[in-house]
Amino acid sequence: MITFDQLDTELQALENPNTIKIFRNHGCPDSLDLYGLKIGDLKKIIRREKLTKNHELAVELIESNNSDLIYLGLLAVNPNKVTTEQIEKWNVAFRETWSQLTFGLASIVSKRDDALLFAKKWIESEYDLTKSMGWQIYSEHINNLPEAEALLQRAKETLQSESNRTRYSMNGFIITCGIYKDDLHEKAIEAAKSVGKVHVNLGKTSCKVPDAISYIEKARNRVN
């Protein structure tokens, strides 16, 4: 079975300066080491080494100081074997880093039975990336979310006063309501109109914030 050191050596040998530059421009801080592997390459390693069956190694990767190794661990870890204490520990570790890591952590939490407890807590956080994770989790659970309408109203009323990445995730929540909740489709369109254009600092990139109304309508047209 492959070890942490062997994985670290393999990833380092695959270092990609161009991707490193892209990831730094997207917000990966200098405080984290970075080899610049693409997500597809990480997933190939997971399949080859059957890392999803090695929970302990995945945890070890997550608790490293290398963004590639951390994300590899987040992709491989068993959500139901992770403790609530570990989740909060990782939240603290990642909340002032960059969105790739918090996106990965939110994806783990979304697969757990207690996901909505974290979402409810995290949207009240003072940390932008933590709050953003809360809204991401709510979006993942949109079809099993009795409070969806109340959250949509909150997004409508407060999005523009929220911090950077939180605005992005709240905009995503409005879009999710508009696409997947027939009973909230019109209210989501109304919310998007009320909110107006959403500005988010996405780093030195050409990435743009999705326009909620056009995104909803295009997605609905594809479905229908």
UniProtKB/Swiss-Prot annotation:
SUPFAM superfamilies: ARM repeat. It comes from the Bacteria. CDD domains: AlkD_like. PANTHER family: DNA ALKYLATION REPAIR PROTEIN (PTHR41291:SF1). This is Uncharacterized protein Lin0241. It comes from Listeria innocua serovar 6a (strain ATCC BAA-680 / CLIP 11262). The lineage of its organism: Bacteria, Bacillati, Bacillota, Bacilli, Bacillales.
